[in-house]
Amino acid sequence: METDLYIPKDDQVIGAKYAESFWLFFFLSIYSAVHLYVLETPIQKQKAGSTADPTSYSTQSIITVALSALVLALASGDEVGYGSFLLVYSQFNLKFSESSGQYLTSLYWTFFTIGRLIAIPLATIMSNQSMLVLELCITIVASIFLFVLNQLTWALWIGTAIFGLGISAIFPTVMSLTENYVNLTGRFATAIIVGAAIGEMICPLAFGLFTTQENPIPFVYLVNLIIFLCAGATYFLIKEGAKSILEKRKMESKEDEREMSTIKVYPGH
């Protein structure tokens, strides 16, 4: 039996053959990631002979960046998947009209924008780690709320607003947090961004494959599953990030000792 991919467009059902476009974007993203990773810029060529930061591409730094990419892949995928298939879910599960579903989607992106604006002043009084934990807690509460009260219209409105508010600033917060842990070079930043883009491709595909007219409830299952996986990945990111900070401090201490020994050898300089 062929599985249909439902996309809100004049109440038509678009077949799963459109999933091929997602795979095309996937392979293009992988190609771009590999190409940008190995590409050497003129600045890097100039610095090739200089002493590089020994912690820049250490195993610990790579693990931390990989976890950051995973967190953003899950968070960005959940963010886009929720916004893309919210109209479908509201129409199939709670019998929303098309206009009501569009208002609901607008509410989601409105609170998403509000959350980004609120995050700006919060960033001046809270640490990146505290902000990320707070955002995840808000998003998890909203997703559980949507799961438990999935048959109530008012719950969908409230849960959608809270979900948009919570998930809005996870992306910039994770980027800022990662910069605290490692030296965020161009290659590392590219790997994280491409990881987020891959999540934005895979998660909506999963939403489309499992959210059907006959059974739209998997929508809230996926919302909860992805955000809990994101929370788990965040735990390991913070744990490995702490190790990266210790490694960086040790290397800086060794570098200071080396400089002090140089000064003792050449006291006149």
List each model region and its residues:
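Intracellular juxtamembrane helix-capping segments at the cytosolic ends
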Residues: 1-2, 168-183
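Multi-pass alpha-helical transporter architecture, strongest
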Residues: 32-40, 222-259, 266-269
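C-terminal transmembrane helical hairpin of 12-TM major facilitator-type secondary transporters
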Residues: 126-174
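Extracytoplasmic gate region of multi-pass secondary transporters
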Residues: 61-114
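Small-residue (Gly/Pro/Ala) motifs that create kinks and tight helix-helix packing interfaces
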Residues: 2-12, 87, 119, 202-211
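Helix-to-loop junctions at the C-terminal end of transmembrane segments
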Residues: 115-128, 211-212
